[in-house]
């Protein structure tokens, strides 16, 4: 029974993790991972996220930081991120609804509320609470003069997914993107199931620890570019390509423009989820002719196995379970 609960938790956390990909393109050298699993103590398992520095190959131009982020973490993690971001000349940040923030690189298309939106609920915020963590949007102060939103709007993504077809009356496309939105805002049946599962985790300290350990193992072990994953239905593969590649292309346009505005001694931080970084690094190195010089690793969150009542045998079993799931997805 206990292992069945672990399996359910594994499926839940794998479904909700914003992480690296499941397969790697064969013709492009793979960047180094932006996540890793560390053991700062004998009984502690920790997820660490990288901030990676890039400088021009010709040594003339501003510094670029690919500041990858985990969307749920400990408060101290986001405090360290805030301190780092506040020190940069410009921060280009992720946010699919740019109109929700006061600073923009450019004016987006008017945002239309997607079908089934429940504005009072966020799956990622609920996930953070269930794990005893905090959600990125609740912990980072975006009201900074150097923070610029650089993302597509919901309507822009819906238009790309529709491929020229008219949108339905409520602004949606009847595509996987709308299904994903309804899961994330809890308005669909599957979203409701996730809500129940998250409450189940929140009510049990040991299951909470197991869920955090599963998330650490899943995010820490996934590598590569998410848009290269094999075996997905065409609609879902297109959705992933839009969510990663189309948004990254939009970001690169803004990044190129901002590089021309700030002095060579300045710096630009690209503040996006870890799943974007593999593709972004390839674009920064090949299109802008930058190369990496250093990494700063920040601990997102940890699990103390001993305090959580997880035995070494159970931890090893969970690690093998997650690794087996990763291997199956990569084979697909």
Regions inferred by a protein language model and the residue ranges of each:
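Positively charged n-region of N-terminal signal peptides that target proteins for export
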Residues: 1-4
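Bacterial N-terminal signal peptides
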Residues: 6-17
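Structured, acidic catalytic/metal-binding patches in enzyme active sites
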Residues: 24-246, 292-317, 328
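Extracytoplasmic/secreted envelope proteins and their assembly/folding machinery
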Residues: 78, 82-85, 249-252, 256, ...
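Portal/gating segments that form or line small-molecule/metal binding sites
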Residues: 237-261
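C-terminal soluble interaction/assembly domains
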Residues: 256-259, 265-305
């Amino acid at each position: 029974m206990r292992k069945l609960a672990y399996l359910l938790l594994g499926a839940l956390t794998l479904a909700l993790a914003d992480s690296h990909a499941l397969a790697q393109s064969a013709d492009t050298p793979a960047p180094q991972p932006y996540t890793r699993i560390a053991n700062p103590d004998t009984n502690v398992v920790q997820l660490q996220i990288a901030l990676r520095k890039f400088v021009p190959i010709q040594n003339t131009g501003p510094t670029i930081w690919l500041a990858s982020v985990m969307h749920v973490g400990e408060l101290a993690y986001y405090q360290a991120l805030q301190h780092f971001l506040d020190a940069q000349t410009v921060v280009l940040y992720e946010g699919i609804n740019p109109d929700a923030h006061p600073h923009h690189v450019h004016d987006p298309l008017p945002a239309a509320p997607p079908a089934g939106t429940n504005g009072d609920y966020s799956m990622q915020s609920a996930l953070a609470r269930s794990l005893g963590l905090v959600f990125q949007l609740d912990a980072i102060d975006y009201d900074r003069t150097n923070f610029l939103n650089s993302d597509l709007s919901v309507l822009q993504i819906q238009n790309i997914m529709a491929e020229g077809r008219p949108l339905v009356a409520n602004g949606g496309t009847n595509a996987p993107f709308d299904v994903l939105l309804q899961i994330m805002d809890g308005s669909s049946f599957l979203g409701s199931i996730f809500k129940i599962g998250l409450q189940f985790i929140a009510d049990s300290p040991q299951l909470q620890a197991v869920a955090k350990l599963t998330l650490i193992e899943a995010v820490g072990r996934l590598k590569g570019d998410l848009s290269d994953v094999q075996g997905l239905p065409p609609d879902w593969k297109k959705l992933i390509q839009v969510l990663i590649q189309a948004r990254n292309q939009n970001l690169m346009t803004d990044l190129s423009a901002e590089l021309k505005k700030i002095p060579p001694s300045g710096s630009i931080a690209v503040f996006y989820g870890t799943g974007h970084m593999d593709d972004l690094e390839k674009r920064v190195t090949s299109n802008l002719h930058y190369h990496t010089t250093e990494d700063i690793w920040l601990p997102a969150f940890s699990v103390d196995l001993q305090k959580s009542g997880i035995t070494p045998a159970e931890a090893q079993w969970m690690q093998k379970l997650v690794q087996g799931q990763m291997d199956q997805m990569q084979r697909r």
